[in-house]
């Protein structure tokens, strides 16, 4: 088959990392004759990655986009130009299917509309699915109606778990829906690095001090680093012999630094580390990781932490309770429960959960699923693909 991948993101987050692994899976597929990858030239890291793939693999063709989703946001004329030029390109490629990387249903819309105008079958790779209007305001209701229309545009969806798949069946009942579980590098579960060695390499004390880490894009709306800081300030005694590492970069980095600098309580225990290309030493050095997000797909750091046999405390959102036991979950927005879970997490047994994650999130499983979702659909558009990963029975025991 002759297939394509479209990504107009200007950032490189977890979804873009999984997209790179998706590309590699398709390159190894004997059923894929040509893989056309459309990426923005201004996303230097992603563009360079795809350029290298094309240089080393004869079946890969790169198409450079002159825009990113961020550069055309709020500019209808720029959006129309992007749709028209991309649709013209798609007509020349003669694709049997185009995978469109969408962080949410309103991202990647230039590719979605272009596929519709070019009459190319569109597969939305969607890690986040909306629940409904945020408030009862007229503005939010109108936005929700617009989103409902957009959920009806893709011919197919691939998402991350059964919880999200169920929501898509409601919003897009006539589209085929499939599951593609994330995976992470085997080194997280095979590393010989010890906690003491990791702490020594990072200049962290190994004297009984508790080390807690938050790893992710610094974005208060989603990742809620501000909530973590609020929890520390509300429970200063609990964090007296604790170091809290915040690893990452993002739009709210300056606000985060200002909050820490303005508070003696936070200054005493919080260390803003910044972005790191290799987070494994920070995971291994930690007693507990935290992810108090407002919304998530299936966060890679959750998988990485569990594979490294480190507990991670996450908010009970978006079906994440199907991955972790109750002892590692807390009600979103509950500071007290969050802190309680953090300091109890060290006693949560991880071996069985790690073994389950190692099986569930393997490269072999991911590649087989990735290759399958790009094949021509055998059901009609009104049916959903019944094939899905077997759910873990570990949490039911």
Each predicted region: which residue ranges?
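Carbohydrate-associated surface elements
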Residues: 163, 183
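Short hydrophobic beta-strand element within catalytic cores of glycosyltransferases
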Residues: 302, 311-314
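Nucleotide-activated donor-binding/catalytic signature segment of Leloir-type glycosyltransferases, i.e.
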Residues: 56-61, 257-274
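An aromatic- and histidine-rich active-site surface loop
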Residues: 45, 79-82, 98-118
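Conserved acidic donor-binding segment of nucleotide-sugar-dependent glycosyltransferases
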Residues: 325-336, 342-347
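A short helix/loop element that forms part of the nucleotide-sugar donor recognition site in Leloir-type
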Residues: 189-205, 352
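A conserved mid-protein helix/loop that constitutes part of the nucleotide-sugar donor-binding site
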Residues: 13-24, 210, 217-234, 251-254
